[in-house]
Amino acid sequence: MLQPKRTKFRKMHKGRNRGLASGTDINFGTFGLQAIDRGRLTARQIESARRAITRCIKRQGKMWIRIFPDKPITQKPLEVRMGKGKGNVEYWVALVQPGKILYELEGVTEEESRAAFKLAAAKLPIKTTFVNKMVM
C-alpha cells in the first residue's frame, strides 16, 4: 500500500479539507477518473480501486495514480481513557477536493476505460465521473 517512506514529523493535526483542487487536468493519459465530492481516501481504498482497474484492463495500456496518501491518521486503542497524548498512527489518507483527477488511463478503448473506472468508483467513498482529454 502507498505511504511515505519517511516524514519530518510522525503525527499531523486534523486540519480541514477546504479549498480548490490542483491537478484537475489530464496530464499523462487519455481518460481519467475525476472526483466530484471532497473527502479522504485511505491507502487501502486507493489500492483496491487500482486493483479493480488493472484486472479490468488485463495488463494492456498504462495507468497513473494521481493521488498519494501523505496524511497520517491516529487512533487510540479501544477502552482507553481520555488524555495521555495523541494516539498511534493507524493509516494514511489523501485529501481530495472536487475536480481532482484520481486515476488516468492510456492505451485502452473508451468503453474499456469506462468499465474499469466504473468498477474503481464502486470502491471509493466519494462520487466520481469519467473524463477524457480534450484534444485542441
UniProtKB/Swiss-Prot annotation:
Pfam families: Ribosomal_L16. InterPro entries: Ribosomal_uL16 (IPR047873), Ribosomal_uL16_bact-type (IPR000114), Ribosomal_uL16_CS (IPR020798), Ribosomal_uL16_dom (IPR016180), Ribosomal_uL16_sf (IPR036920). GO terms for biological process: translation. GO terms for cellular component: cytosolic large ribosomal subunit. Keywords: Ribonucleoprotein, Ribosomal protein, RNA-binding, rRNA-binding, tRNA-binding. Part of the 50S ribosomal subunit. Binds 23S rRNA and is also seen to make contacts with the A and possibly P site tRNAs. NCBIfam families: rplP_bact. This is Large ribosomal subunit protein uL16.
